[in-house]
Amino acid sequence: MRKSLIFIGLLFFGLFAKAQEMPLMRPIPDHSFAHFERNHLVFPGDNTAMERFFAKMDSVIFLGQGNVSIMHIGGSHVQAGSFTQQFRDNLFSISDELMGGSYFVFPFTAGKTNNPSHFMVSYTGEWEYCRNAVSRPTDKRMGLAGAAVTTTDPEASISIVTRERYPSDLQPEYTFNKVTVLGFSETENVVPVVHCDSVTIPGLYDEWLSTYTFQLPDFTDSVCIGFDSVAGEFTLTGVLLDNGMTGVSVHGVGVNGASVPSYLRCDDFERDLDLIRPDLIIFGIGINDAAEKNFEKETFKQNYGELISIMQRVNPDCALLFMTNNDSFKRIKKKKYEVNPNGKIVQQAFMEMAEDYGAAVWDQFDVMGGLRSMQNWEKAGLAQKDKIHFTRDGYKLIGDLLYNALIESYMQHVRQNAKQ
């Protein structure tokens, strides 16, 4: 692996030193209503944190050493999976040997809601689901995933397969030999186990982290999680897969309807975040905040400040990348919509926060065409009729755009360092 990555590093160096056309960029279709020529990362303030992240990327690409962890966090745009999947697949299309060891997932299918497209889940038994976007007295404690599934069914199980629902030529193969189940039993008599072929594997319990870790006998792309008790209750709040490889890991964390306060309500968020310890956090939260009738920019920034404080306690050196909201509309009556003007306010808020926190901004709002542009995306088959969400093709396109903006900035970093 190391030799292959060093070869990729030399390829990077040669291309950048000669300032040739950048072949690692994804092709972007021409749409006159969009501003794709402005698809760049913007740094309203200091870029030291991003340079630090790029230096870690250098270590992986040029030396074949170390690990880089990227987390993309948001709402339904992230839970759908296609956006993060496209960004992730683009990154690993440079070389599948860039793929790092860890992979955080949540089995949404067991909660009878849509599962991200970049892995598949099946289940047996009865499960109860709760999510951070809806507050109920019966909700269980939640962590990084922003969701939880609970069962009292002794026959319950969850199976996870790391294959994409919509395979593409870019899709890398991911296998693992270590599984960490995040969760707890309030009745204290239910313990998860892993079924691998005909063997039942017990886990190593960490009381502080509330995790059960299972070492598998071989590398695999699938796992079945069951339980060793005939009675009681267990709540699962996430699953971390790992294979011990060096490289880049990309984690998608998204819950339908989630706003910034949604994640602040998750009691175990900070504790769980330390399991993946991101070096780059891509913030895609904001579309649901901006949909509120009494949306206020300063409250939005204050909430984000609390969330960023959590992130920085886990990793003070992590780089932050804010995504401005996509343009969106509100339904005021059946088949009648009006544009949500808060998109411009959120755009300004992110620019201000980026200056305050030394973060980057990917100005999705501007790149897609600005206010009312979602109508054009819908006409082009890239956005859904609700004028909030994208179609699968639309999510793939914004995944390409985000990837291009980040890799362009990284290429500039490499080129500048090549001159030194």
Each model region followed by its residue ranges:
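Bacterial Sec-dependent N-terminal signal peptides
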Residues: 1-28, 415-420
